[in-house]
From Swiss-Prot:
CC per GO annotation: cytoplasm; nucleus
Location relative to the cell: Cytoplasm; Nucleus
One Gene Ontology biological process: odontogenesis
Keywords, sorted A to Z: Cytoplasm, Nucleus
UniProt function note: Plays a role in odontogenesis.
Protein name in the entry: Protein SSUH2 homolog
InterPro entries: HSP_DnaJ_Cys-rich_dom_sf (IPR036410), SSUH2_homolog (IPR052789)
Disruption phenotype: Morpholino knockdown of the protein results in increased incidence of agomphosis (absence of teeth).
Length: 361
């Protein structure tokens, strides 16, 4: 008689809560993470002294020439396969108006720390739990990358590692085969378990048994435990996950040109002001009041928000002047508009009049 499938008495894949020891300073640590970022200690560096933003002699960028506007327009049209060049060659420019668009940007480079219980097969690694108290999450040294370069690092917390029986295979090193449920055999796929073919001849594939050896476990009924890799034991420890990230926020002063603000996200401008230090102070004395107000709001928000769960390592604020030129032109007696913007001379022409249908063969 063939073996019946074995009942699944083995442990769940998720480790039980009592598998992990209580480590002072790490009481909220969970397996697999999810405990959130840990609040950092109070900063030891005092707040910087307010500095007034400098006043450059000229806040304005000269408007581009008509020839440069046409060149940018021609490049834009040639990059669109469904645009004909008629408006470029025959269009008549009737007016060009330049707008100075200021973009304020604050970047806050932070270090965040979280912990999680981790495990790996035990192969003789050092075990140090209880030898001495584990250092606190923010007492462990971690070398940060250069400022504003995002990076992650996992550090094994000293004096937290211990040995436990594998919770998945219950310390046996193997587990029932999931294909045959531990029986070592399964229903013959040729005769569907009947032992004979359609003409009542004995099934040659299973020799009339109606079952065949399981190919997944070679008939053993079990396979090596994927969690402990057959070692029967696990070494469990706390991992400190350190994350360095740059939090960025922009403000673009409205210039009344009509160009959508999101078009400016991927272009650059002329850098008018740059300030980088541990914690910056809001820009003061800038000619455009909306930029100064945005700086006050964003700096306050960043220092309040990120200081709760992260350590602020550096802040950098810049003000760029992004050139925007609105070009009015006529073609076949009708008025149209396009914009040339950024140091890259990008073009936006939403009402381009000479388009055709394209099809891909």
């Amino acid at each position: 008689m063939s073996a019946s499938p074995a009942a699944n008495t083995f442990g769940a894949s998720a480790p039980p809560a009592n598998m992990f020891d209580t480590v002072p300073g790490y009481e909220g640590t969970l397996a697999g993470g999810g405990g959130g970022y840990l609040p950092p200690p109070m900063p030891s560096v005092p707040m910087p002294v307010p500095e007034q933003a400098p006043h450059p002699p000229d806040w304005h960028i000269p408007s581009i020439s008509e020839e440069r506007a046409r060149e940018a327009f021609a490049t834009y049209v040639s990059s669109n396969c469904c645009y004909s060049s008629g408006p470029v060659t025959d269009g008549v420019i009737t007016n060009m108006q330049s707008f100075n668009t200021y973009r304020y940007r604050l970047e806050t480079f932070t270090e965040s720390r979280s912990t999680e219980w981790s495990q790996e097969p035990y192969s003789g690694q050092p075990v140090d739990a209880g030898v001495q108290p584990a250092p606190g999450p923010w007492q462990i040294a971690a070398q940060p990358p250069p400022f504003f370069q995002d990076q992650k690092q996992a550090i094994k917390v000293p004096f937290t590692s211990s040995i436990k029986n594998c919770h998945v295979c219950l310390g046996m090193g193997n587990k029932p085969c999931t294909t045959c449920a531990g029986a070592g055999n399964k229903v013959c796929w040729v005769c569907n378990g009947s032992g004979s073919r359609l003409n009542d001849e004995r099934c040659s594939h299973c020799n009339g048994q109606g079952r065949e050896n399981c190919s997944s476990c070679s008939g053993n009924g079990s396979s090596q435990c994927d969690t402990c890799h057959g070692k029967r034991q696990l070494i469990v420890f706390i991992n400190l996950n350190v994350k360095w990230s740059t939090e960025k926020e922009d403000f673009v002063a409205q210039d009344l040109s009509g160009l959508k603000v999101e078009k400016l996200e991927k272009v650059s401008g002329k850098e008018l002001f740059k300030d980088s230090q541990f914690m910056v102070y809001p820009v003061m004395g800038f000619p455009d009041a909306s930029v100064a107000q945005a700086s006050q709001r964003i700096v306050r928000d960043h220092q309040t928000k990120f200081a709760q769960t992260s350590r602020i390592l550096q802040q950098r604020q810049t003000i760029e002047l992004i050139p925007v030129t609105k070009v009015n032109y006529t073609w076949k007696g009708n008025p149209y508009v396009y914009y040339v913007y950024g140091n890259e001379f990008e073009v936006n022409a939403e009402d381009y009049p000479a388009t055709c249908c394209c099809s891909v063969m």
